[in-house]
Amino acid sequence: MDRIKIFLFTLLIFFVSGGFAQAQGPISATANAELLSEMPRRAHFTLNAKSSAGDITEGRVFFQPIGSGARISEPVEFDQAAEVNLEQEWNMQKNRIPPGAKIEYFWRLTDSAGNTFDTPKQHFVPLDPRFDWKTLEDEELAISWYDGNEAWGQQMFETGKEALAQLEEKLGADITRQVRMVAFANKNDFQGAFPTTNSWIGGKAYPDLAVTVQIISDGSYSWMNTVLFHELSHLVLNQVMEGSIVPVPAWLDEGLAMYNEPVSRSHGKIEKAAETGDLLPFSYLQGNFGADGQEVNVAYAQSEMLVTYLIEDCGEDGFRQVFQNMVNNMPIDKALEAACGYDDKTFYNNWRQTLPNAPSTQAAERNNSPDNESAPSAESSSTEDDSSSFILILFVGALFFIGLIMIAIIFVVIRLLRPQGSKT
């Protein structure tokens, strides 16, 4: 399919969308939306509406970020008249809507004769009003940046297209809606867009909104390659899994993203962690990796090695089938078993046996496998599981001891209350 690339320069104040809504009955309207020029980031919706049947009595604007699943509706106060001009602001920064999110909006109008009219749905993509943005896009990918010339943007765009093609082949799926990457030049600019974010955060991904916001400075080719291949993996996988109620474990999501990076740095880390006994239990890799820098680094590397082993052992077709099974709402253990012939615990133990200082399979199952019923949080560990059992034993013992005391007390009370023989 031929893809049309559109290159556009966006001004500091964006006139992002607008159009005339043809009349349906007596009401007609023209709606626009723009990004205001001052921070915080705010969308400004405006409308001119007319009715030939009476006064416009009610106006309400509806808007939502595409992919959010939640539509916001806000009534607008105004003086009723046959022709009105309405406006409404929306603080996107306060509502944690990232730069690059695609916004859909329309207006609903009512006049005094009871006529109603919805304007056609329109879209705009607000970025950050502090910078002069450039965007290169087609139906699959949009790259927005301000630091660097057109050649730099073209390089990012081509790298992103290469990453998407690799992901589509690896997952056996096509991109169903455009994914967008927004590149800030440095940490200060990034922090200005996300003022409440921890200072150590260097990027944000919004898979449901199909947006990733990253720090990529002009000319940083190696970093740009790494970021695009990694971050686009999360966005594509989210599209693949749309409609499924089965969660993708963190080791599979992050492991696939790491696997897609052009250069792997994980093999040596994991061999060293295996030799020193610093590998993380499988339970740790199911959810959020936490905030401990050393553990997070091991978690990412371990996840990449797990995905690498899975692809090599189960094959490309089997790997794709795992995701297809999950799309059909098979949990990960069943999805692996159906596609590869083993559940997740057996898979993990098989991988573990390929590393130095490998424990016995039985030991690996005891220490590293999650409970069948639920995946522990990132903070969980086998030590905490063992301590929980010990606490349970103490609790049962205490109940038994208290029971003995209660029996003794009851026995004494009965003896004291027993009627004594009458005196003669």
Segments predicted by a language model, with ranges:
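Bacterial N-terminal signal peptides
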Residues: L8-G18
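Glycan-association/targeting regions that enable binding to alpha-glucans and other polysaccharides
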Residues: A21-W133, E139, T424
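Acidic/His/Gly-enriched intrinsically disordered linker/tail segments
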Residues: S199-V211, I216, S222-V227, Q239-D385
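Juxtamembrane/start-of-transmembrane alpha-helix segments at the extracytoplasmic/lumenal side
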Residues: T383-G403
